[in-house]
Amino acid sequence: MTSYGLAVRNFVGPGEVPDIPGLYAYAERAEALGFESLWAWDHVLLGVEPSFPIVDSITMLGAIAARTRTIKLGTGVLVLPLRNPVVAAKALGSLDVISGGRLILGVAAGWYAREFDAVGIPFKQRGKIFERNLDILTRLWTQERVTLKVDEFNLREAVMVPRTVQKPRPPILVGGYVDAVLKRAGAIGDGWLTYFYTPESFTKGWEKVKAFAREAGRDPRTLTSTNQLAVYVGSSRAQTAEDMRHWLSTEWDTAAWSESTIEHAIHGSAEECVAQLKAHVKTGVDRIILIPYRYQPEQVERIAKEVLPRL
């Protein structure tokens, strides 16, 4: 059965200021309405002209954890090569402890070269660095003592406690589009997380992930899939089309090398949104992260009360 998460607005448009009290209220209401999970976006820097304000994802989820009790907390997705993996293991492991075992770790290799330059990480080596960092992080979470020397990292009987609440560790979803990423998702991740994919594109990508899992000697049935979709519940598709297209084309990116597209958008009357989402549910996707139009509280209410009960 498909579960439904909700994206949080820790990332805002140019010239805006993140509304922290509003974010807390949004998270508390999402939990009360029965959403399965909340997902924070991740960048260190994003954009020059314009630039996009973004609150750190791990910090934001930690604050939300203190104000909620049961809703799961996901990074959608953390740019792992930008983080020191030992420090990331500590911060993320602590988040799992603080939240009582609610972390879902979505990770990706990243795409914004300026961000890598600013942090001092070689952009063209991000795939290799991603795999190295993920290996170090998972070792620290799952092994009693870690002894490993790789690149600049020299772990000598490193012990990371307290242990994560989830055993053997929190679930790790690999985000991205190209075959190298899909292979990582199938071979070393617990599943795949993608963004703005139509049902057809999602099915194509997920079949590849499962094939890569089988090649690695893994059972694809142990993996989970997640797709992120923008949703606008209005009176009709005609009424919602222009506003949705403008929002997606001015505040969101779709990678040219992927099949992500603003044409994925779920919009229209409640009945029309239900019909469009049913096409995604039929793909067998395990989780859909909904991005409500402009994160409006009334959209969250309408999605929870008029759309989800009919799926």
Where are these regions (language model features)?
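N-terminal beta1-alpha1-beta2 module of alpha/beta enzyme domains
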Residues: 1-67, 168-170
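N-terminal small/glycine-rich loop or linker at the start of catalytic domains
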Residues: 1-15, 70, 112-117, 151-169, ...
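A structural motif
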Residues: 35, 100, 189-190, 285-286
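Short, acidic/polar
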Residues: 17-30, 91, 174-184, 269-279
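Active-site mouth loops of central-metabolism enzymes
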Residues: 8-20, 78-86, 168-177, 259-271
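Internal, glycine-rich beta/alpha segment that forms the wall or movable "lid"
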Residues: 2, 50, 84-188, 203-216, ...
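Alpha-helix-loop-beta-strand connector modules within alpha/beta enzyme cores
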Residues: 51-74, 131-136, 140, 305-311
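Hydrophobic faces of well-ordered beta-strands that scaffold small-molecule active sites
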Residues: 4-8, 38-40, 73-75, 103-107, ...
